[in-house]
């Protein structure tokens, strides 16, 4: 079983995360940001990851530290994963009504993000849309994953939700175990 617990305790956030990569899509997420909980739940469900996340953040300031630190902690959980026999690459194209999100992932030990997301609104509930790209940068830097994404559409809720669903599907594909693979790198290490 590939299950991990990660805790982060700073002056800005207190986070406890439990992740089972080989889960069934069960989730219990409490970040204090309702829409963020919603899209993280979509990530877990569509990635078939069991995810428990308890966060106490300085939301009286804004949601930046909470979103950033969740990306850091989730990234660290995936970085802890044994890389032997994983498929390494994952991708997904997910529609949601008028919106469409494309995500491509390489779990190759090289963090890099190329994101094409332009918000039409500043907020979805109490979630700042400017933090979408920052979440993925925080995740990528800590998971050491190369991540490309592109989102089109009009409805901000649909765009961001489609993106997190595509993220879950692509991560599920990339983390899937294939015993034939060994270390999927000509270098012999990831």
Swiss-Prot record:
Pfam families membership: IGPD (PF00475)
Localization of this protein: Cytoplasm
Record EC number: 4.2.1.19
GO CC annotation: cytoplasm
CDD domains named in the record: IGPD (cd07914)
Keywords assigned by UniProt, alphabetized: Amino-acid biosynthesis, Cytoplasm, Histidine biosynthesis, Lyase
Top-level taxon: Archaea
Entry keyword annotation includes Lyase: yes
One example of a Gene Ontology biological process annotation: L-histidine biosynthetic process
Pathway(s) per entry: Amino-acid biosynthesis; L-histidine biosynthesis; L-histidine from 5-phospho-alpha-D-ribose 1-diphosphate: step 6/9
UniProt catalytic activity: D-erythro-1-(imidazol-4-yl)glycerol 3-phosphate = 3-(imidazol-4-yl)-2-oxopropyl phosphate + H2O
GO function terms (MF aspect): imidazoleglycerol-phosphate dehydratase activity
Record PROSITE patterns: IGP_DEHYDRATASE_1 (PS00954), IGP_DEHYDRATASE_2 (PS00955)
Primary location: cytoplasm
Gene3D superfamilies registered for this protein in UniProt: Imidazole glycerol phosphate dehydratase, domain 1
Annotated HAMAP family: HisB (MF_00076)
Family: Belongs to the imidazoleglycerol-phosphate dehydratase family.
Name of the protein in its database record: Imidazoleglycerol-phosphate dehydratase
Organism annotation: Methanococcus maripaludis (strain C5 / ATCC BAA-1333)
Taxonomic lineage of the native organism: Archaea, Methanobacteriati, Methanobacteriota, Methanomada group, Methanococci
């Amino acid at each position: 079983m590939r299950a991990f617990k990660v805790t982060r305790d700073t002056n800005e956030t207190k986070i406890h995360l439990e992740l089972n990569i080989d889960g069934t899509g069960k989730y219990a997420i409490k970040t204090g940001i309702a829409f963020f909980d919603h899209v993280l739940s979509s990530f877990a469900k569509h990635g078939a990851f069991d995810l428990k996340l308890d966060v106490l953040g300085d939301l009286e300031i804004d949601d930046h530290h909470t979103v950033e630190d969740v990306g850091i902690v989730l990234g660290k959980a995936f970085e802890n994963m044994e890389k032997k026999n994983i498929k390494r690459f994952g991708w997904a194209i997910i529609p949601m009504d008028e919106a469409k999100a494309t995500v491509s992932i390489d779990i190759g030990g090289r963090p890099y993000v190329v994101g094409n997301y332009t918000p039409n609104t500043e907020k979805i509930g109490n979630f700042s849309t400017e933090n979408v790209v920052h979440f993925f940068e925080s995740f990528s830097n800590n998971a050491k994953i190369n991540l490309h994404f592109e989102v089109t559409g009009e409805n901000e809720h649909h765009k961001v939700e489609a993106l997190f669903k595509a993220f879950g599907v692509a991560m599920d594909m990339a983390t899937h175990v294939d015993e034939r693979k060994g270390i999927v790198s000509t270098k012999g290490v990831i």
